[in-house]
């Protein structure tokens, strides 16, 4: 640990700024560590109880138990309304259950709380694409890639939508 990490941050500085700068680097492998650091930070609410609700909601989502996932994640967003990860996770569960309106609202809230939430932007792109809005989906994917240019899902989606736009989709 260097001495710089022991110094207080200037007022208004985000401790993730360095990680986001590393994430945006076009070459090298440092972005993988930065991505991991960012995702780990985003998954911490500051409350063990809220973190447990997130874990339970995500586990239910992984099992495909959407009602349970939505229940846990709704409890989380009710009790931790400033925790972006709760809204982003609930948006995934809502979208998987076909509730696109509420899912879009949750993604909007996620992005208000954390404008650099590249996962939410990629999720938004996928949802807009599924809803038949390829132009806005492309905008969301591109916004996500401006923050995190190494996301294969977003890279592939941009290429696919650009091919479709040009009429060369195969």
Regions found by a protein language model. Name each.
Residues 41, 75-76, 109-110, 143-144:
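Canonical positions in the second alpha-helix
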């Amino acid at each position: 640990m260097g001495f710089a990490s022991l110094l207080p941050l200037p007022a208004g500085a985000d401790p993730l700024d360095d990680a986001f700068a590393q994430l945006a680097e076009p070459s090298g492998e440092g972005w993988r560590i930065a991505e991991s650091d960012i995702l780990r930070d985003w998954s911490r609410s500051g409350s063990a109880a809220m973190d447990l609700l997130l874990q339970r909601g995500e586990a239910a989502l992984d099992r495909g138990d959407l009602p349970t996932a939505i229940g846990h994640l709704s409890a989380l967003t009710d009790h931790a309304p400033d925790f972006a990860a709760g809204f982003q996770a609930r948006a995934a569960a809502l979208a998987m259950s076909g509730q696109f309106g509420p899912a879009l609202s949750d993604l909007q809230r996620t992005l208000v709380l954390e404008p650099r939430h590249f996962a939410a932007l990629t999720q938004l792109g996928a949802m807009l694409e599924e809803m038949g809005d390829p132009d806005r989906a492309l905008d969301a994917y591109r916004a996500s890639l401006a923050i995190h240019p190494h996301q294969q899902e977003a890279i592939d989606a941009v290429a696919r939508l650009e091919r479709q736009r040009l009429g060369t989709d195969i």
